[in-house]
């Protein structure tokens, strides 16, 4: 089964940048909100769904199992189910399901569970192809909130920020052979973050770009050689790097909360040049910002303190507009519009413009709390909630009616 540019096969979409490139969406919704196509009860977890062709892949926890399910994307009907035991317990009382969004590539589904269980599953049949217990294999210490970064899968490699070691050698980042799970290389002593790596090309050279617990890191995906790095983390031990790097041409935008802030760098060969950095513009706690026409759109501030929704000039870091105490959420760029899903379960549509925030449509689509990033494919939105007794996954038709 091939993956098209209109699918949503991984975290943050086809290019892992939060951009939807499918058919246009409606500019307004009925009074009751977008048409609900189907909904399905789901288990625990912060992992959003992914869509490839007519398949939706859901990764959640049901009882004491982490479960991977394939559904018909248009009807919600089950296709297959794959499960394995889990004993993960959250030390802070949060949801105990998986955090990392699955990846669909080359006819396989890759999942990375809360305890570091990395699995490759056949997309057509649901049969296990290979699996690695990365926590045990690489002696990974339990982090604050479990394993959360979705692996980067490209060119026959699965690259993950494991944060461990391999027989005395550093294994902060590990590359596995995509078809067999064999270890290709291990690199760096960087601990695991909650951010997902992205693939980028600088000066004709393919690069794996990561924001680990220690900071920004660029690796040669073929060998694991370090191409560039820059420390970027809070002085507080009880802090996280969670938003993914955003690549814009030869520049990389990174952001974190906990008095860390944001920075924009230019990549020239193996050299990083800082363009600007500050903590007052766009400190992303969990959700990754999107870029449109030279403006960043995203959340500024800690999730638990009701962050602001902001527009920030990419070139300078100047704040163009800010909606204070907006509540946390996720933002997706669809054409020239922002699709915002708040933790409260409210979906909003607004033009991506730097002069003011002007919502065009809004609707309550799920009960709180919604932390998982939604999937948007062929004009259909797939979103799920968690932290309730009645978690559900919903499919909405956002196409013009």
Where are these regions (language model features)?
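Noncatalytic, solvent-exposed loop/strand surfaces
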Residues: 3-401
